[in-house]
Regions:
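Bacterial N-terminal signal peptides that target proteins for export
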Residues: 1-13
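Periplasmic c-type cytochrome electron-transfer domains
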Residues: 2-5, 20-382
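Bacterial N-terminal signal peptides
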Residues: 10-22
């Protein structure tokens, strides 16, 4: 992990890093993009880490960002199907990992936030997540807690009364941009030239991934890096198949409610049917009905269950879903808005097994065994 460690030396020195290409990534990943408006420093990262883990920022004092994005669970809340917020309230979506979220061009499953800074503000005030009525309780804490006051002054050169949610969001985002992980057996095999790094089943699975499985169409691998996502949105038949008969009535009613001021962030996490509208809830484009963001496959073996709704329990279930053409069982009706590339694959049992083995080879070393928070954040191995 030398490339990442070297980048962290610059952060630890408190250096303001260059625009948009600041933190070198580990083997297999590109540099982490850093916005010009939110340069990285070690002090800002440390502040963001504390904010990320502070349970006082929920209405019950029992939930933090880390509750659903647990470092010990690859920054998810595995094995929960959908996340639990305050008072054990259950939302509609599976918690996506924060690992490598810095590389996404949109945040949330439906892409309703453009960046980590914007994304970080919403869970605080969602009724089924952290349940605050507004952001004022957070500002009250950070403006009065002596340690926060000192940290915000050091990082942003601001007095307590001038601390804003923008400062909070910037610090959390800075912390999240340090949570990157590559250097998997696949990376060592493909980018490091170590042909012994993957076992035979994973090597065969890699060929299925590139060929008959057609996985690489969306989970992109490039010559010198692999994000394993195209940063686009697709209807792959998960979730929306259950509500397809409701769509003619549901979609126009949602658009009408949205025009009247419906809070989309709250609606998609509280109403299961509304949640399944996917990217359509943001863009209102019929071609994005039931479409969700392509997740990265890095460390996917550590983040079960799968899909935006957690409806598929194992990696084998996921492969079978695609092999059946976007349905759990062959012969089931597919929705009318299924993305064009989704069709039956006719993979053999051996190919399915090998494909799972390949995805397991995408696990970074810090997630291959019980991890420590310091190792995860620093990008090293425990």
């Amino acid at each position: 992990m030398e490339r990442h460690s070297a980048s962290m030396l610059a952060v630890m020195a408190g250096a303001a890093l260059p625009v948009m290409v600041a933190l070198a990534g580990p083997l297999g990943l590109p540099p982490v993009p850093v916005p010009a408006a939110n340069p990285m420093t070690s002090e800002k990262v440390a502040l963001g880490s504390r904010l990320f883990n502070d349970k006082r920022f929920s209405s019950t004092g029992e939930v933090s960002c880390a509750t659903c994005h647990d470092a010990g669970k690859a920054f998810t809340d595995s094995p929960l199907t959908t996340s639990e917020g305050i008072n054990k309230l259950t939302g509609t979506r599976n918690a996506p990992t924060v690992v490598n979220a810095a590389y996404f061009t949109h945040q949330f499953w439906d892409g309703r936030s453009a960046d980590l800074e914007d994304q970080s503000q919403h869970p605080f005030v969602n009724p089924v997540e952290m349940g605050l009525p507004n952001h004022e309780p957070i500002l009250k804490i950070v403006r009065s807690d002596p340690e926060y006051v000192a940290s915000f002054k050091q990082v942003f050169a601001t007095e307590p009364s001038a601390i804003t949610m923008k400062h909070v969001q910037m610090a959390i985002a800075a912390f999240e941009r340090t949570i990157v992980a590559g250097d998997s057996p696949f990376d060592k095999y493909y980018y490091g030239g170590d042909k012994t790094a993957m076992n035979e089943a994973a090597v065969r699975g890699f060929q299925v991934f590139l060929g008959d499985g057609r996985c690489v169409s969306c989970h992109v691998i490039e010559q010198d890096q692999a994000l394993f996502t195209d940063n686009r949105f697709h209807n792959i038949g998960a979730g929306i198949n259950r509500i397809q008969d409701k769509i003619p009535e549901l979609a126009p009613k949602f658009i009408e409610a949205k025009a009247k001021g419906l809070d989309v962030d709250k609606a998609v996490l509280s109403n299961p049917s509304t949640s399944e509208l996917g990217r359509f809830a943001i863009t209102e484009g019929l071609d994005e009905l039931g479409a969700f963001k392509t997740p990265t496959l890095r460390n996917v073996a550590a983040t079960a269950p799968y899909m935006h709704d957690g409806s598929l329990k194992t990696l084998r279930d996921v492969v079978v879903h695609y092999n059946n053409g976007g349905v759990t069982n062959k012969g089931e009706r597919v929705n009318d808005f299924l993305s064009g590339g989704i069709r039956e694959l006719n993979l053999t049992e051996q190919q399915i097994t090998d494909l799972v083995a390949f995805m397991e080879a995408l696990t970074s070393p810090q997630f291959a065994k019980p991890a420590t928070v310091s190792a995860l954040v620093a990008g090293g191995t425990p």
